[in-house]
Amino acid sequence: MTQVAKKILVTCALPYANGSIHLGHMLEHIQADVWVRYQRMRGHEVNFICADDAHGTPIMLKAQQLGITPEQMIGEMRHEHQTDFAGFNISYDNYHSTHSDENRELSELIYTRLKENGFIKNRTISQLYDPEKGMFLPDRFVKGTCPKCKSADQYGDNCEVCGATYSPTELIEPKSVVSGATPVMRDSEHFFFDLPSFSEMLQAWTRSGALQEQVANKMQEWFESGLQQWDISRDAPYFGFEIPNAPGKYFYVWLDAPIGYMGSFKNLCDKRGDTTSFEEYWKKDSDAELYHFIGKDIVYFHSLFWPAMLEGSNFRKPTNLFVHGYVTVNGAKMSKSRGTFIKASTWLNHFDADSLRYYYTAKLSSRIDDIDLNLEDFVQRVNADIVNKVVNLASRNAGFINKRFDGVLAAELADPQLYKTFTDAAAAIGEAWESREFGKAIREIMALADVANRYVDEQAPWVVAKQEGRDADLQAICSMGINLFRVLMTYLKPVLPTLSERVEAFLNCELSWEGIQQPLLGHKINAFKALYNRIDMKQVEALVDASKEEVKAAAAPVTGPLADSPIQETITFDDFAKVDLRVALIENAGFVEGSDKLLRLTLDLGGEKRNVFSGIRSAYPDPRALIGRQTVMVANLAPRKMRFGVSEGMVMAAGPGGKDIFLLSPDDGAKPGQQVK
């Protein structure tokens, strides 16, 4: 019976735009992609979207460290992330960024609606402030002991051990991650989302039965401990969206990050010229289904704040959250020193994407359990399942069909009942894919693969091929094997997209869920080519070694201008305003007798002359080349008496020194004496 086509919007949590994608990230994106591909095979309309989470202090500070703008950094990181996901065949319809016009407009819209509906509160709070860096410290830039479970080295917004959320001021023995200093308290006005007003709605949503049991149980604990108002603002300096009518105040990254789901979908609709789907999918009474695949570390934000924000701004809530656990490697947390902290791009340099997709899928269930990537078991399972059980089934039969029957399959099935057993399994396997019991689906498929190989073993086509007068039997046996292989690969298509493409080319037909009800009879297949290569532990060793080398390279001293000359301590605007910078014309320039470093410059400030000694001789061996050039000088620097005379200011130059000194010059049109602002 044909299913009624559903409209489904699927998202993965947004990767943060300050680091590379690693195998921990890939678990979620593979899980979601397998589910999405299955839904598409069943004829549903699926929009699969994601974006980079591109705001926050960490991005601002890292960009400063790299000597580039935050916009440049997040642009480069987004390209890298998209490349990695494409390499793993994650079939996104759109991959966007939270730093976008769509996201700004939607963030402001949701905030405005929440404010108009009375869900935004203002109050002055005491915040942790780094006295050495001169900045308020965001949650993730304070670490200390969790006030709930007493676990050490936890961030200032939530505990990675017990999952609790709290204010940074509640941390025990807090330290600034930026400088290591002990923060002090400073007052600042902040904006709060009134989460407790949605307690009744959230509890009803929890009791609806849609959420995973572990998620619902955890939410109940949070309800019992009482919901708190949520601070949604951050003080400048901050890379993000400024709050409307609140200069110097910015949306906290966790407010605009989930709105990024909406922003990415809006961007997709706009690119398609679709003016109706955004409203259709996000309106309060939408019939479309909305699913978020997320890790267990961000359940609090997605199960409480996000649905409450949507409810308070008159948008629909998620249909469900699909939560997964963490990834360990060889039974332990991913380790850079052991080479098991593996980037997605590094993996693809040593293995194909289908291998990891298969291994993760074989271990996943609908529960929030951690997944262990045991690299030795990985090699054994991929070889045993994909190579020996599935691909080998095709190679054992295709040769006879190609050589003896010109690639044409038999006109009838040798064992219709066996074929029916395979196609009847579609319901159970489909239900396993649907309910995200992926490991169960793989077990059932591999059990069928064992049956198929046992059939070939018993029929022994290599023996039949040598017996005269049994050509029809040989064709029937091998055609049966090929048809069983086709069914198996149809069931595996959501997991193994690259292998599936090769199989479709070999079988000369599309692998479709409904199509297996009609076996391939009298059908011509193409010549068999190797579909999948066996893997070995040498590849694993090379992968681990490469990961270790990447860590060494990353840990090497940073080079470049910022490494050689780090940015100085933050100053106030009032401090900066004391420095009077002026355009100056170099009227004369010459050597200083008795000094091999200095040049004597005579500067015209538009009516006033200054005499300045500058240590730029090594870069300008012919001082006459400077005459007539304009530069910038500090005009209000106290005169300095030197043995060569009095220096009445300082000219501005860049560079590390020696021959690499570069005198700064204003743009064309600037006039001597004009102030640099």
Swiss-Prot record:
It catalyses: tRNA(Met) + L-methionine + ATP = L-methionyl-tRNA(Met) + AMP + diphosphate. It is found in: Cytoplasm. The keyword NAD does not apply. Its EC number is 6.1.1.10. One of its GO terms (cellular component) is cytosol. A motif ('KMSKS' region) lies at residues 333-337. GO terms for biological process: methionyl-tRNA aminoacylation. The keyword NADP does not apply. A motif ('HIGH' region) lies at residues 15-25. Zn(2+) binds at C146, C149, C159, C162. Residues 575-677 form the tRNA-binding domain. Keywords: Aminoacyl-tRNA synthetase, ATP-binding, Cytoplasm, Ligase, Metal-binding, Nucleotide-binding, Protein biosynthesis, RNA-binding, tRNA-binding, Zinc. Its main location: cytoplasm. ATP binds at K336. Binds 1 zinc ion per subunit. One of its GO terms (molecular function) is methionine-tRNA ligase activity. Pfam families: Anticodon_3 (PF19303), tRNA-synt_1g (PF09334), tRNA_bind (PF01588). Its cofactor is Zn(2+). It comes from the Bacteria. Belongs to the class-I aminoacyl-tRNA synthetase family. MetG type 1 subfamily. Is required not only for elongation of protein synthesis but also for the initiation of all mRNA translation through initiator tRNA(fMet) aminoacylation. Homodimer. This is Methionine--tRNA ligase. It comes from Salmonella arizonae (strain ATCC BAA-731 / CDC346-86 / RSK2980).
